[in-house]
Amino acid sequence: MRHIAEAAWKVNESIENIGARRLYTVLEHLMEDISYNSCNNKNELVINIDEEYVSKHLDELILNNDLNRFIL
């Protein structure tokens, strides 16, 4: 959770601080792959969202300053 909140904070600091709405968009981006591809993995009942998963899905986006996706 800390890593997710930190990602939202970094994006808020980089563009415009829109508070919790930014956290919502970060969570939405993080869950996008699971939402669209979970039906392909019917045998997997547990999906672990740990720091490694969060880093894999959010760090590149933040480091590349590809933040246009987070503008509401």
Swiss-Prot record:
Entry keyword set: ATP-binding, Chaperone, Cytoplasm, Nucleotide-binding
Primary location class: cytoplasm
Gene3D superfamilies, per the entry: 1.10.8.60
GO cellular component: cytoplasm
Subcellular location(s) per record: Cytoplasm
Residues that bind ATP: R21
GO molecular function term, any single one: ATP binding
Family: Belongs to the ClpX chaperone family. HslU subfamily.
Subunit structure: A double ring-shaped homohexamer of HslV is capped on each side by a ring-shaped HslU homohexamer. The assembly of the HslU/HslV complex is dependent on binding of ATP.
Function statement: ATPase subunit of a proteasome-like degradation complex; this subunit has chaperone activity. The binding of ATP and its subsequent hydrolysis by HslU are essential for unfolding of protein substrates subsequently hydrolyzed by HslV. HslU recognizes the N-terminal part of its protein substrates and unfolds these before they are guided to HslV for hydrolysis.
Name of the protein in question: ATP-dependent protease ATPase subunit HslU
Organism the protein comes from: Buchnera aphidicola subsp. Schlechtendalia chinensis
